[in-house]
Regions:
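An active-site-proximal structural segment forming one wall of the substrate-binding cleft
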Residues: 32-39, 44, 51, 55-58
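A short secondary-structure junction motif
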Residues: 6, 55-58, 62, 99, ...
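A structural signal for alpha-helical segments
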Residues: 43, 64, 68-71, 111, ...
Length: 311
């Protein structure tokens, strides 16, 4: 909040390899959005408005240049939509086009921008996100294509995922490759967002498949323990280096937080975001029980009639 009324963004944003790194800010935007939906704190709107005005001022050649932010620009795009739906500021649509223009191209039919499992699970939805603004059906089809493409080759992992220990690699396509915990929760988030964008029950079913078959095997119920990689029928959980069978070098079967930071940051988002999408509004002022878990919800339907759902 202290940065919202000044031009200190340039000083506060990390530099990575001499370039501005916006990825960390994308994560914080989602945190602020959740906080605003809980609190209605106007400071969130003011901060995001000022921040996005600054983003619009950054030249294209300096915008979304780092690997992570370039892959994951779709997360930034969703935040721009979120703010536009609350303010209607027209400059946000210009920024949305700029973000898509400078984000990695996830519309490629076969050669993906990269084969990092978390990026694929997280970023395949970017074209569909842009479709919401443009109405270009090719964008929507591109997201379906990436989802299906990765599973045609590497989809030998039960529980909705695909084989990619860090990266999906030709020659390493059997279930033993497993998948990262990061990939699980980002796939769930993408499924939830794709469900909201399309209304296609495929995404609800797929999210449930990951949530109840893969995710519980990757973390302890109290989140005090987690795996970097979870494989079907995994019988070993040691701290040895299993490279090159596993892409990364190090103790990646039993997660060691002191040797790698991976999966420690987003592993807990799975259930909160899942819970947020259990009950959804429908275009006819109704409500849909879109995904299933024990829950209670009080919602308004029709002409504003309040009802309670208990599942």
């Amino acid at each position: 909040y202290s940065s919202a009324a000044s031009d200190v963004y340039k000083r506060q944003i990390n530099e990575r390899n001499g370039k501005r790194e916006l990825w960390a800010q994308m994560i914080m935007l989602w945190c602020l959005q959740s906080y605003y939906e809980y609190s209605n704190d106007q400071r969130v709107i003011d901060l995001m408005t000022n921040y996005f005005k600054w983003q619009l001022s950054v030249p294209d050649e300096q915008f979304l240049e780092d690997y992570w932010e370039n892959s994951r620009g779709g997360d930034n795009l969703l935040s721009v939509y979120w703010l536009y739906n609350r303010t209607g500021d027209q400059f946000l649509l210009e920024l949305a086009e700029k973000i898509h223009r400078n984000t990695a191209d996830w519309t490629r039919p076969s050669a993906l921008p990269n084969w990092h499992n978390v990026n694929i699970a997280q970023c395949f939805r970017e074209p569909a996100t842009y479709y919401m603004m443009t109405g270009d059906s090719a964008m929507l089809k591109a997201s379906y294509n990436v989802h299906n493409l990765i599973r045609r080759t590497f989809g030998q992992v039960p529980g909705g995922m695909f084989g990619a220990d860090e990266n999906a690699r030709m020659g390493s396509i059997d279930p033993r490759q497993g998948v990262e915990t990061c990939g699980l929760v980002e796939q769930m988030a993408s499924d939830e967002l794709m469900l909201c964008m399309t209304g296609d029950p495929l995404w609800a079913e797929h999210c449930e498949e990951v949530a109840f078959n893969s995710y519980p095997a990757a973390v302890m119920p109290d989140f005090k323990g987690l795996r970097y990689i979870t494989c079907p029928n995994q019988t070993v959980s040691d701290s040895k280096n299993h490279h090159p069978g596993i892409d990364n070098r190090g103790p990646f079967l039993a997660m060691n937080p002191f040797s790698s930071r991976c999966c420690q940051h987003n592993h807990a988002q799975g259930w909160p975001y899942y819970a947020e999408h259990l009950i959804l509004a429908t275009p006819d002022n109704g409500v849909a029980a879109a995904m299933y878990a024990a829950c209670k919800a009080t919602v308004k339907v029709g002409d504003g009639n309040e009802i309670s759902l208990h599942e």
